[in-house]
């Protein structure tokens, strides 16, 4: 989708370097951009806003995930400068601040798979609670849950 939107702007070589995958968390998009395309980050951000109609903000991930809270540095490249959004997954709603806590929508299938393994009466310890996604998904069952 992104490569198609930029086909008249980027050269074929630049298009090949473009990372076509991005994370969409509510109305926020987080995109990785190779160093060779940093000078075109605003154009890439604008193209994403135009392609993803519910998106209001596009951030460039300018650092890898790091630190105790596994956060990443984000730089606004298009849209509104807000890092908090509502995210929906498996009939649950979450308010997530993508700048303050690690969150990956790519793990939704894994969170659902693991939560389906939990049986009533079990004790579950979630050692890496983050924003609480896994814990809230499993809280629908009758068990003891500790989130750290």
Which residues fall in each region the model found?
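SAM-dependent transferase fold signal centered on methyltransferase-like domains
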Residues: 1-148
């Amino acid at each position: 989708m992104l490569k198609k939107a930029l086909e008249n702007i980027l050269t074929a070589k630049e298009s090949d370097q473009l990372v076509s995958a991005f994370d969409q968390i509510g109305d926020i998009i987080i995109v990785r951009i190779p160093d060779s395309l940093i000078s075109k980050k605003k154009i890439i951000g604008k193209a994403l806003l135009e392609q993803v109609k519910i998106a209001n903000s596009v951030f460039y991930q300018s650092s890898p995930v790091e630190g105790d809270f596994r956060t990443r540095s984000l730089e606004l490249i298009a849209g509104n400068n807000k890092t908090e959004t509502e995210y929906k997954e498996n009939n649950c709603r979450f308010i997530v601040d993508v700048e303050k806590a690690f969150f990956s929508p790519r793990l939704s299938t894994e969170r659902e798979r693991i939560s389906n393994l939990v049986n009533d009466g079990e004790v579950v310890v979630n050692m890496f609670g983050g924003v609480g996604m896994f814990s809230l998904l499993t809280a629908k069952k009758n068990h003891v849950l500790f989130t750290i």
